[in-house]
């Protein structure tokens, strides 16, 4: 059996890929919201009740959660001796820490990185994998809507691909949001938009899509930008680009939370499909 922690929008869709080809996929309902329970039911996941029960019954655990929770998730199953797949947006350095937690107690580790939207149709989403057992995980998804690919020979190659990809997609989204806000504060936004229409005709539309995506999910991207910054620093590259991107996304409130930081750019609107990965 396969354990899935947890069935958020991405996790539930990944779980559905597994159940659609006959795998039993366990999840833990304890402490989870009604929305999560509904997603798990729609994906035909089997409720084991607690994370401990998932770890006791599953031979493989797939972790799909926000990057700030990746290490905590590994601690939650500390002592698990099966195959642990971390498919979160974390730096190679964090991935090595998670791998150490798992392998220190006899488990095996596969690194993963998901690029694209939740896999509900073929060709939309890739799961990059690396590590000695990567091909075993790849085989689980054969024939499903999730395209799995081996990223490289190093243990954390998959995380490196995810960091490099997100550095562009979400990093440039943060940059264009900052540019729009700068122009607005200086009173030249309409002039800038007119110039974009002449020389960069796709930028206004992109900035609107980036703002809408950030309004919905920007708070989740703060930790990812910090992980990318750490990846850059570890490679002796400037990390300031993505530290700044983290600060931009930090200004977007968790939806429904009134006491969150002000989002100066959220007036631009919403497009949950931009950016992806």
Describe the predicted segments one by one:
Residues 53-108:
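Rossmann-fold NAD(P) dinucleotide-binding segment
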Residues 1-56:
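NAD(P)+-binding Rossmann beta1-loop-alpha1 motif at the extreme N-terminus of oxidoreductases
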Residues 160-259:
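Helical "substrate-binding/catalytic lid" subdomain
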């Amino acid at each position: 059996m396969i354990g899935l922690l947890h069935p958020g929008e991405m996790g539930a869709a990944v779980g559905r890929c597994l159940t659609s080809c006959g795998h039993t996929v366990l999840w833990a309902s304890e402490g989870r919201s009604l929305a999560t329970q509904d997603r798990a039911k729609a994906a035909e996941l089997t409720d084991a009740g607690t994370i401990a029960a998932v770890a006791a019954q599953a031979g493989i655990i797939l972790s799909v959660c926000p990057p700030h929770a990746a290490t905590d998730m590994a601690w939650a199953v500390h002592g698990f001796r099966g195959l642990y797949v971390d498919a979160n947006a974390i730096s190679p350095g964090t991935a090595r820490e998670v791998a150490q937690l798992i392998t220190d107690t006899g488990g095996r580790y596969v690194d993963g990185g998901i690029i694209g939207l939740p896999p509900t149709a073929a060709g939309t989403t890739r799961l990059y994998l690396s590590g000695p057992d990567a091909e075993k995980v790849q085989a689980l998804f054969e024939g499903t809507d999730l395209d799995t690919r081996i990223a490289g020979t190093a243990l954390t190659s998959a995380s490196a691909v995810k960091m490099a990809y997100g550095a562009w997609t979400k990093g440039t989204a943060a940059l264009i949001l900052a540019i729009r806000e700068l122009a607005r504060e200086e009173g030249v936004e309409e002039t800038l938009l007119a110039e974009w229409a002449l020389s960069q005709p796709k930028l206004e539309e992109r900035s609107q899509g980036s703002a809408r995506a950030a309004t919905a999910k920007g708070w989740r991207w703060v930790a990812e930008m910090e992980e990318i910054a750490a990846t850059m620093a570890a490679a002796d590259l400037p990390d300031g680009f993505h530290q700044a991107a983290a600060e931009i996304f930090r200004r977007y409130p968790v939806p429904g939370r009134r006491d969150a930081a002000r989002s100066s750019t959220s007036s631009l609107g919403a497009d949950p499909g931009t950016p992806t990965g």
